[in-house]
């Protein structure tokens, strides 16, 4: 209720006493309450996953070499180095926990949809969290791993490019790349906290929750949700 409504409720006490009860006393109580910070500002306290930093780094570079060869194009190397520099040692647990949840779901036959800005992270793609390749539009050969990047702005994403065969081995090229900057995810300088949203199958979701409990422990995992309500005047 508003202050005026509360004053009306206590009007039987008289104007001065009602003001004391509704305004003066609550303000006095509020002044007695000390402001405290439950957690130090600007710090994160992520859970621990053994070898998460080493595992993420290994997964990313193994997948990079699998797709783009033993000597991948420099723009890929530069992009991964920038991303990993912002992630390793700070957010590797976030990535590896998501990777483990996605991998377990896929092993059980259920696809996982990643949504939001995580698609702009090449590390997320190389580690198997998302199917969105954030590199510029390009062709890549699944056989000899030769690649050609289109960086003149003529295409917004690889899916729009014409079909083409690899000039090295004659294999049909894979068209890939959606040209999304990493800053969309972690901001300039990697200052944002990563938020990885994953959509699991309704049939599998409870099992994904149990897997999270297995990773971190019963007392370290909780559900966050939204409760929707309707006012009685709009319900018929």
Each model region followed by its residue ranges:
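Short, well-ordered loop/turn and helix-capping segments at boundaries between secondary-structure elements
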Residues: 12, 28, 32-35, 128-132, ...
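Conserved alpha/beta enzyme-core scaffolds, especially Rossmann-like or related mixed alpha/beta domains
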Residues: 37-47, 148, 186-204, 210-231
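Residues immediately within or flanking Cys/His clusters that coordinate Zn2+
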Residues: 134, 138-139, 162-164
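Short beta-alpha connecting loops at secondary-structure transitions
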Residues: 2-14, 153, 191-198, 222-225
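Conserved phosphate/anionic-ligand binding catalytic regions in large, soluble enzymes, centered on
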Residues: 105, 109-131, 213-236
């Amino acid at each position: 209720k508003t202050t005026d409504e509360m004053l009306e409720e206590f009007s039987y006490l008289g104007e001065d006493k009602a003001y004391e009860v509704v305004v003066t006393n609550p303000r006095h109580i509020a002044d007695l309450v000390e402001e405290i910070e439950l957690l130090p500002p600007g710090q994160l306290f992520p859970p621990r996953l053994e070898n998460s930093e080493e595992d993420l780094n290994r997964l990313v570079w193994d997948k990079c070499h699998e797709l783009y060869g033993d000597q991948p194009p420099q723009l890929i190397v530069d992009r991964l180095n920038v991303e990993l520099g912002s992630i390793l040692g700070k957010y590797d647990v976030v990535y590896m926990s998501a990777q483990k949840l996605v991998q377990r779901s896929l092993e059980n036959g259920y696809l996982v949809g990643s949504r939001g800005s995580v698609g702009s992270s090449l590390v997320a793609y190389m580690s198997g969290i998302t199917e969105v390749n954030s590199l510029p539009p390009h062709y890549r050969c699944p056989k000899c791993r030769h690649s050609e990047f289109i960086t003149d702005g003529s295409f917004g994403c690889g899916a729009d490019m014409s079909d083409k065969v690899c000039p090295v081995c004659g294999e049909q090229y894979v068209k890939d790349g959606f040209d999304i900057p990493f800053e969309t995810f972690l901001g300039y300088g990697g200052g944002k906290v990563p938020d990885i949203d994953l959509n699991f199958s309704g049939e599998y979701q409870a099992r994904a929750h149990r897997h999270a409990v297995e990773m971190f422990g019963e007392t370290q995992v909780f559900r966050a949700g939204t409760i929707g309500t309707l006012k009685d005047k709009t319900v018929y």
